[in-house]
Each structure stands twice: as structure tokens, then as C-alpha cells.
Amino acid sequence: MFETRMNALRHRLGKDGIDVAVITDDDNIYYLTGYYDYLHMEFGRPTILMVHRDAPSVLITPTIDLNTAEAAARVDRIAPWNDGMGAEWRAELPALINIAKRVAIEPDHIPSVVRRYIRELISPDRLTTVTPVLNQMRMIKSSEELQLARHAGQVANAMMTAGRAAISDGVQEFEVAIATSQAGTRKAAMLLEAHYDDTNMSPNTHFLQIMASGDTITKTHHRATTRIMRRGEPVFLCFCGMTNFHRFKLGFDRTFWIDEIADTSQADVYAVALASQNAALSALRPGVTAESVHAAYADVIQGAGYEYPFRCGRATGFSYLETPQLVTGDTTI
């Protein structure tokens, strides 16, 4: 699977006249090589994948993660680097870049320290972007990715079912978060053992639960707290970020009420939300643009007297934000 993707990228590089691609986005490195669970730039440690259109691929990664790279990464060569030794992660770049006429980077996903060094090596007119190429590749899901998506959906359903069951009058919000995390982890573990060979992939659900209840319901990204939920209150559960099975990410949310809807005006608002979603689903089909789906959804919301809404949705995959997005300006068909 990873070798197929790497070869497809090489083919696209050759077609687009790009000699070497400098891949620094963690999700793209995983997508192309299968390498994951290494420390990132938050700890000042660059990991760089160099993909030449007709030469061996090179993975530059910290020595502290070398054993992980050797076990997971499908690349031609691994170049480890260590703090304070020689030129560190810079050592390999001159030879790999200087042989190239056109070098493609990920402008929105390259650490500034890496970008500055590359600009010392070559002139700006030799730089281009590889992001559109990778986005187009990742939009079309393989059969393996579709299986991951279905299994991620099963994990998501397990979390939502557990969260709904935990919601009750007198319960604190964080108890719901514990329930969703445990249910997701157990379902993921079952699926990993039944369908996958990678014993290093963790089943643990890890994300700070987004949820809100009562008078905090309009705080979109409110986190689970010690607040005690009460009868008649709305409870919002969001799983954008939490549903991450085998690195495949899904995003969705649901709203519940405890026993009854105390404020009946909330039911009217919820009905608009459901109608807007149905409008988007009705518009979604082959041959339409992403922004037209958003427009159908937005028309319902504005028609009900509300302001122009935030984007309708986004694609799913190995990143939290994937192409295309259901938003004004995205003309992807």
C-alpha cells in the first residue's frame, strides 16, 4: 500500500516536472511511508521525507526514533540525525536538493527552520509546491482506506452510544467523556486484533472531549468539565478529533436532551439544523462542486432567519482537515 503511493507520487512528480519533493507534514509522511509515533516539531525535531522522482527516497529522522523508523518506514534509506552532532538534520539536504532543478515543498506544513535552510540552498524561483499533488492523491480513497473509514465509523458509533447512555440528570460532564473514551478504545482494540497486523498501533482514544451542556451549549468547542447536567438541558457531544482509528479520522457530532426539552425553542433550532443537513445530503452527488453542497445547506439556514453559517463539512482521511472542504470557494468536483 505505501509502496504503491510512493510510486504514484514519483509518477506525478515526473509528470509535473518536479525533481524532488520535501515532505514534512506528519500525515503525509505516514500516508507515503507508514512511519508514525515519532516526536514532532513541538520538540524541535524535524523529520523530513525526501522523494526524488527517479532516485531513492530518504527519510531524515532523529536517532532517538531510529528503531521505530526501521520497523515502520517503507523507504529506500533512513538518515538518522542527533542533537549536536555535525549538521544534524541539515546534513543530507544539500546533496539531495542541489541535484534538483525544481524542488517542491509543502508551504503550509513545513517548519520555518527547515524552510529557511532550504532557501539558503536554492533560489526561490526553483521552489514550487507539492501540496496539490498530494491532496489529489489523498482525495481518492483506496479499498484499504475505505475499510479503515468503516471501522472508524464503528468506533465512532460505540463512543456515541456510550456517551448517550452516560448522560443523565445529576451526572458531571467529565463522566460522559470517560465513557466515550473507554468505549472507543475497547471497540478499536477489538477491530485491531480482528483485522490488522500492525501490533504497534494503539487502540486508545485520545483527545480532550468536546462537549457542552445547559447554558454552555453555544460554546462550540467547550470541553468536558465538572459541571453537573440537569433534566431538560441540551447536551452537545462532538467527536471531531476523538474518532481516530488506525490514524483514520472522522468528524461528527450529536445533540441530546435529558428526558425532555425544557426550552421548546431549542427544538425549533435543531429542526433547522436537521433540514440544512438533509439539504446538503440531497445536493451531494457526483458531478457537483463542493461549494454547491455548502450553498444548499446555507440557504436553509439563512432562509430560517439565521446568519450565513460556517462551512458545511470537510473530507475525511488521515488528517483532521482534508480536501475537499464543503465551503464557499472550493470548486472541487
Which residue stretches match the model-derived regions?
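Active-site neighborhoods and metal-handling regions in enzymes and metal-associated proteins
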Residues: M1-I333
